[in-house]
């Protein structure tokens, strides 16, 4: 009984850590995107995974044990992907050399993204632990119901395939929206660059006029 209580408490502690880090990652990814003038798919991936995890924690108590195990596997894969992609892009990047402007701050976004790498790595490890715990729970319930381990694994694989298919369908539907956002942000950035270039040209023209006027007056 003591062992069961200790295991339950440990599992709930892991859940609280996962929830806290997911919310932290959600805030960091949001700030990184806000301070980044352009659309960054890697930062958006981190934000999307954080939202998925937050929703998952809200409904996990209503899910059956087998579906929880499948969702734990999916969460582990998602956090591993988010962690690896974020670390590969921002891990070795020098943030101090990146430009800053009135409407954008690449340097600040880079620094926030670097900080965000650690929570994502920890979340990946925590989900590995809860995935294993969920697997043990599924096996114990299967033994109580007289089911074999093989049948349980087959059911898990089928549920996992269905979940992956649904995620792929959702991602395919969201790609056109992301492409439109990328085009819009690229257009806005181009217009800002053109405006700044026109301002510089006008300033140079005014300066040349002043110089020409000074020369004529001297003559």
From Swiss-Prot:
Disulfide bonds: none
Record membrane topology: Multi-pass membrane protein
Record topological domains on the Vacuolar side: 37-41, 85-116
Transmembrane region(s): 16-36, 42-62, 64-84, 117-137
Gene Ontology annotations for the cellular component aspect, listed alphabetically: cytoplasm; fungal-type vacuole; fungal-type vacuole membrane
Record bears the keyword RNA-binding: no
Major subcellular location class: membrane
Keyword set includes Glycoprotein: no
Subcellular location(s) per record: Vacuole membrane
Keyword vocabulary terms for this entry: Membrane, Transmembrane, Transmembrane helix, Vacuole
Top-rank lineage group of the source organism: Eukaryota
Residue numbers on the Cytoplasmic membrane side: 1-15, 63, 138-219
Region feature (Disordered): 176-219
Ranges of biased composition (kind: Basic and acidic residues): 206-219
Bias type Acidic residues, positions: 191-203
PANTHER family: MARVEL DOMAIN, MARVEL DOMAIN-CONTAINING PROTEIN
Misc. remarks from the entry: Present with 339 molecules/cell in log phase SD medium.
Protein name per UniProt: Uncharacterized vacuolar membrane protein YNR061C
Organism name: Saccharomyces cerevisiae (strain ATCC 204508 / S288c) (Baker's yeast)
